[in-house]
C-alpha cells in the first residue's frame, strides 16, 4: 500500500505506527494530531529507528488534515480514553463530536480512503462514520474482535500451558462487557477448547476476556491498553494492504446478516484489498443467539442516542 494515515498520535496511534513501519506495510505513513508537535515528534522518533529495524517506510506528522491527501486507509484512534471505572459508552458523546470533525476532514482530503475505526465506543462510532460519509460498508469498519479474540487466546494459553500458536479464539458482538466469546468456534489445533478446560476455567477465561481492557486500565491507572490494540490494528491493516483475504472478527455494518440491518457489530469478515470483502454469517445455537442479541441491544441503545 502506498499511503496510510493514523489520526491520533497518542499511545495507541504511536504504537500502531511503530508496528506498521517495522513491517514495511506502506511506503508513506502519516500521523495527524491536534496537539502541536505531537504527531511530528512521534513520526520522527519512529523514523529514527529505521536503520535499526531495517524498514523503508517514510513517516511524517502534522496538525493539518491536508496531510491525509492520497491516503488509501485512515486509522482513527483519536478521542478521549476511558478512566478507571468508566465504560466504553461513557465516552460516547465527546468522541462522537470529535469523530464528526475528523470524518469531515477525511471526506475533504481523502475521499477515496477506507476508514478503520478504533476509538470507543467503536461499534457506535463505526456506525456514525458510515452514516456521515454515506460510503459503502466495505470502506468503513472497526477494530474490536481481533483484540478481544487475541486476549481470549492469550488467556487460554495461560490456563492450559499450551502454545498460543495453536490457539484460535473467536469473539463476536459489541466491544464491551456484553461481547460474545464463541467457545464452540474456539480451538486448539482444531480441537475444541472444551476438551482441554474445565467449565470453571472456561468461565474464568470468558469473564477475563470481557473485562480485559478494564483489567489493564485498573492496573495502569494512568492509561488504557495500547500495545495489544495496536497489534490488533496492525493485523487488520496487514490483511488489507497485502490483500491476504484473512477471516478476522471485524466491526461491520450488517445488511441482513444475522437477521439485522442498520447496526454495526463485531462479526467474522474476510478482509482484503477492498476492505470488508464479505461478512460471514455463522450458524448460532440458541444460547449463542441470546448472548448475541443482548450484545446487539446494547449497541442499538447507544446508536439510538445519536438519532
From Swiss-Prot:
Family label: Belongs to the LDH/MDH superfamily. MDH type 3 family.
Protein's recorded name: Malate dehydrogenase
GO molecular function: L-lactate dehydrogenase activity; L-malate dehydrogenase (NAD+) activity
Annotated substrate binding sites: 82, 88, 120, 151
Pfam family, one: Ldh_1_N
Chain sites annotated for binding NAD(+): 8-13, 33, 95, 118-120
Domain of life of the native organism: Bacteria
Encoding gene (name): mdh
Active-site residue numbers: 175 (proton acceptor)
Reaction(s) catalysed (UniProt annotation): (S)-malate + NAD(+) = oxaloacetate + NADH + H(+)
Amino acid at each position: 500500500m502506498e499511503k496510510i494515515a493514523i489520526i491520533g498520535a497518542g499511545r495507541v496511534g504511536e504504537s500502531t505506527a511503530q508496528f506498521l513501519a517495522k513491517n514495511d506495510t506502506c511506503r508513506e505513513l502519516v500521523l495527524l494530531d491536534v496537539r502541536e508537535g505531537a504527531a511530528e515528534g512521534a513520526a520522527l522518533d519512529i523514523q529514527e529507528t529505521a536503520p535499526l529495524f531495517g524498514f523503508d517506510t517514510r513517516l511524517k506528522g502534522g496538525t493539518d488534515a491536508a496531510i491525509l491527501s492520497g491516503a488509501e486507509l485512515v486509522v482513527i484512534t483519536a478521542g478521549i480514553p476511558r478512566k478507571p471505572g468508566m465504560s466504553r459508552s461513557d465516552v460516547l458523546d465527546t468522541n462522537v463530536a470529535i469523530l464528526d470533525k475528523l470524518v469531515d476532514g477525511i471526506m475533504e482530503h481523502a475521499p477515496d480512503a477506507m476508514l478503520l475505526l478504533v476509538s470507543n465506543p467503536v461499534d457506535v462510532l463505526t456506525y456514525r462514520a458510515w452514516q456521515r460519509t454515506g460510503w459503502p460498508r466495505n470502506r468503513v469498519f472497526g477494530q474490536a474482535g481481533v483484540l478481544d479474540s487475541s486476549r481470549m487466546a492469550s488467556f487460554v494459553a495461560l490456563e492450559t500451558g499450551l502454545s498460543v500458536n495453536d490457539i484460535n479464539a473467536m469473539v463476536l458482538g459489541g466491544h464491551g462487557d456484553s461481547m460474545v466469546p464463541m467457545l464452540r468456534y474456539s480451538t486448539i489445533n482444531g480441537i475444541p477448547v472444551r476438551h482441554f478446560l474445565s467449565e470453571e476455567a472456561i468461565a474464568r477465561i470468558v469473564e477475563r476476556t470481557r473485562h480485559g481492557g478494564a483489567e489493564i486500565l485498573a492496573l495502569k491507572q494512568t492509561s488504557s491498553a495500547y500495545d495489544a490494540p495496536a497489534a490488533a490494528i496492525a493485523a487488520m491493516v496487514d490483511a488489507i494492504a497485502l490483500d491476504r483475504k484473512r477471516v478476522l472478527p471485524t466491526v461491520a455494518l450488517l445488511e441482513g446478516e444475522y437477521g439485522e440491518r442498520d447496526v454495526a457489530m463485531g462479526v467474522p469478515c474476510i478482509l482484503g484489498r477492498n476492505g470488508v470483502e464479505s461478512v460471514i454469517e455463522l450458524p448460532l445455537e440458541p444460547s449463542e443467539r441470546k448472548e448475541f442479541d443482548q450484545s446487539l441491544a446494547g449497541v442499538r441503545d447507544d446508536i439510538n442516542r445519536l438519532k
